[in-house]
Amino acid sequence: MMKKLTGKVAIVTGASSGIGRATALLFAQEGARVVVGARRQVELDSLVAQIKAAGGDAIALAGDVVSEVYAKALVELALQQYGRLDIAFNNAGILGEMGPSPEVSAQGFNDALQTNLTSAFLGAKYQLPVMAHQGGGSIIFTSTFVGYSFAFPGVAAYAASKAGLIGLTQALATEFGPQQVRVNAILPGAVDTPMYRQMNDSAEAQAYIANLHALKRVATPEELARSVLYLASDDSSFVTGTASLVDGGASISRS
C-alpha cells in the first residue's frame, strides 16, 4: 500500500510526549521525514532513535517554542536537512496556571498565551512563506474542546489560549488559501497524556472526565495522531480553515 506522506517533510512540535510523539511516529511510518521539536533533548533523542530503528528518517532540535529564534531555526533545519517543508504540526502546549480566575496571576495567564497561542503563530510565521513558495502545504494546530463546545471552571488561561488558535486557523487559512496552503486545527477531548494525568491525578477524577464523553473513555495519543495524519495528507486536500472536533462525543454528551 502506498504510504500517505512519501516524499513529504514535516515539523512536529511538542514531540517529546503525548499527541506530538505519537504523530511524529505515525508521520515517519507513513513516509515523511520529520523534524521534531520540544524542550527536552533526551526525549527527542529517544524519539529519533525509535523512528530510525523502524526505518524512518528524523532529526531533532530542542528549544523553547515561545522563542521566535527557535521557530525560525526549526524551519531552517528542515530546509537544510531535507530541502523542503510540506507539513507543520504546531502542537506544543501547557495547561498553564489553574484555579479560580481572580487568583490567576497575570504572568500565569500570559505563560499560557505564549506557549499555546503565540508559539503557534511564530511557527506559522516562518512555515507559511516556505510552503507558499513551494505551491502548497498543510499546517495543523492543536486546540481543544475546552472553551469551544465544553467548559470547566478553573482553566481560564488554558481555554482562552487554545480558543485563540481557532481564530488564528481561520485567519491564516483565508490568507494563504490562494497559495494552496491549508490550515486546520484539531480539537481533542480528553487524551491520555502526561498533561491529562497532571490535570486529573486521581482515579475518581479520571472516571469523571471519561464519563463526560459519549464513548465513556478518553482517547489514546495514537487516535489523535490518525486525525492529524488525515489533515496533513492529500486525503484532506479540500479541507482548510476547520476546527475539527476529535472529542469522543464530549461536545454532544450531557451525562
Go through the PLM ranges and name each one.
Residues 129, 148, 174-178, 237:
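Alpha-helical segment proximal to the catalytic Tyr-Lys
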Residues 9, 16-17:
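Conserved glycine-rich cofactor-binding loop
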Residues 178, 185, 207-235, 239, ...:
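C-terminal helical subdomain
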Residues 99-101, 105-113, 209:
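Substrate-binding pocket helix/loop in short-chain dehydrogenase/reductase
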Residues 95-98, 229, 240-255:
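Short C-terminal tail/terminal secondary-structure segment
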Residues 124, 161, 169:
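Active-site helix of classical SDR
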Residues 42, 62-74, 106, 222-223:
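The beta1-alpha1 cofactor-binding region of Rossmann-like NAD(H)/NADP(H)-dependent oxidoreductases
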